Amino acid sequence: ELRSPQEARANGGYFNGPTDVAWDPDGNIFVSDGYVNSRMVKFDKHGNFLMDWGSLGSEIGQFRLPHTMVVDRAGEVYVGDRSNSRIQVFDSDGKFLRVLLMNVPYPSDYQPPFTGINAERTGRGSTQPWAMCLTESTPQELWVSDADPGRIYRMALDGTILGWLGSSGRQ
């Protein structure tokens, strides 16, 4: 249902830089309101506001840019918290479940394109999840794109890295 800005604000539907949308198995709608509000918002399948969670920060349940998300068959919500270099997993009511990290070594000849990246000191990077999708297979797998070092990660839902494709560079 389309709402006026005043109605939307009162019902949790006032966004500032939303970055992604996903649905759970029950049809509930999740929106990552990332660039300014640093929160997740949940609506029922009719667009009625149910709840929101999160705030700006780096603690569990906080976000520094919830940029991408997916919902698995069990209704768990995977939020790519890009600027905190992690994926946070929540139940469908916003209860924190676990953190997934893509902490794999960079190639020895890798040159980070930005300053301040950990790779220069440790050989491991601060990966940043940019986009995610889930397979339809059983068990489901999570595929995550990462801007630096330019990889696509294949992950089990418990966070185990199953492999990756690509490397940073230009065509």
PLM region descriptions:
Residues 1-171:
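Eukaryotic scaffold repeat domains enriched in small/polar residues
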